Amino acid sequence: MRHFLSELCILFLCMGIAAGCGSGNGRNDTALPTACSGFNGTKVDTQAVCNLDVLCRVWGYAKYHHPAFYGTKGQLDVDAELLRLLPTICNADKTERNRLLAEWIHSLGEFTEAPERYESYCGEGFRHEAATTWTADTAKLGSELSDLLCRLRFADRRGFNRYVKPRQPGSSSPDFSRENGYPNLTSPDTGYRLLALFRYWNVIEYFYPNRHLTDKQWDEVLPEYIRRFTECGPEGYHAQLAMLITELHDSHAMLYPAFLPAEAFIQVNAQFIGDRLMVVPSQPADIHTPIPDDIPAWPPLRFGDEILSVNGKSIDSIRSDIRKYVSCSNETAVGFRTTVYAFTSTDADEYVVEYRRGNATDTVRIATRTDRNAREFIDFPKYAVSEEGCMLINDRIGYIDAAQFSNEQGRRIMNVLKNTEAIIIDLRRYPSDFMIFAFLGKYFAPYAINHVIFTHPVYSLPGCFREDRPAIGHDNPDYYRGAVIALVDGNTISQAEYTAITVQALPRGLTVGSTTLGADGNIAEIPLPGGYKTLISSLGVYYP
């Protein structure tokens, strides 16, 4: 009886949402129920996929273009609007679909056009990443809906959109924190899964500076994942989210909680040498001294051992999982993520690691740890240098470890290194301070140098990005005249990559090493239904 009453309550709740399809400016959707969406289809035919594709585009376009979602006026909840539309749009024919969507846009309220406000965004220094030409397709959308969408492009919008704005005044990074992540939604039904897909797809469409760099055309991703998100069921939702995010091939684009999680780990320092996962030294080394072959890693593993499998799973198989479920910009990132996951992929008390030493193969059991805050999962090579993070390798060559560097020590560092012929800046670990302007610009630039091009969103015209060409340095006759060498590898990411780009812009700057992880630029966080969060690179970064 208790079970029956629970089911009855849920049924009435779902019916209430489905029935609440009224329109008009007066509706208030701030108290959206979250038990179920009112749409729980599990199969979609070709027409339904087409309908949902159009719905996603029109809903997202209106969300970011209609004045009803700007400023502090009105209380429309854009998620509730979508959930109301889903059941009727999914099963409509094309004519009915277009009529209903046009009626919905009318219901959001009247708007005026102000094309003159956007004229400057069509000139030099702006890039238009979103493909908005689909709004003019009258054969697909019908004349009324198409006309409304085309007019919305240059609607008179005031203030910021309620679902995206700059992170802080003067910031270029978007803030999506007003999006509802529905953290108490433990088993998202079809409607909420499609809400996640539609929200994410439109964020990328209008606010992702690297949209044009995805391996698969972003337009092609939508219909494919409409089927996936509809048919996967609540139990497959997490995996589909992970695979969707992987379509970006952006090493910043992590999903939390990860689809490949674990609570326990072993601390083995390893990295790919070619296609082989090799154990490498894990403790600080003197840069002058060759590394002996018998340095222990985590006993009984030693420097030079090749890891063949972990818990019965080959390294190639783990790498395949990473490609499928973890967003990686390049093969270097695939190798890095594989290395991390190989040793954080179980909740068991121990790992079984198969390894090769010389011509012999053996297996070892290593106890796991759960004190994740004790230290990093994987140690990166580092050298014992001074407290200032610098040292003289010899009279001609200086060395700076970016991971131990501080701008406060800049003057003292240059006093030590100023008479050298070259300075190596080691960027193989994440910089501990932002050295671009206060250090590199101050001591290494003879004049103002445009070292990078950034692109960041124009919030009043979604899909448009403004170019920014910042400069480092000023007229400085006493600048350092030696060579400046950025040392990079597969651990170099984000701010470290930006630092390397800046070094290359210096008069005698160059980069030495191997391919970096490929995730430059600031990040933005996107909440998704079910309490999930994901990141994107939110700033386009280009060589000048």
Regions found by a protein language model. Name each.
Residues 50-60, 77-84, 96-103, 107, ...:
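Extracytoplasmic/secreted proteins, especially bacterial periplasmic and envelope-associated proteins
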Residues 33, 44-51, 62-77, 87-89, ...:
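Cleft-lining beta-strand/loop regions that shape enzyme active-site pockets
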Residues 69-178, 196, 209-275, 347-352, ...:
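Extended, small/polar residue-biased N-terminal targeting/export presequences
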Residues 17-20:
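C-terminal motif of bacterial Sec signal peptides marking the signal peptidase cleavage site
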Residues 58, 62-66, 84-88, 200, ...:
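Conserved PDZ fold ligand-binding element
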Residues 22-28:
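Bacterial lipoprotein signal-peptidase II cleavage site
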Residues 1-9:
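Bacterial N-terminal signal peptides that target proteins for export
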Residues 47-48, 56, 60, 131-167, ...:
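PDZ/PDZ-like domain segments forming the peptide/carboxylate-binding groove
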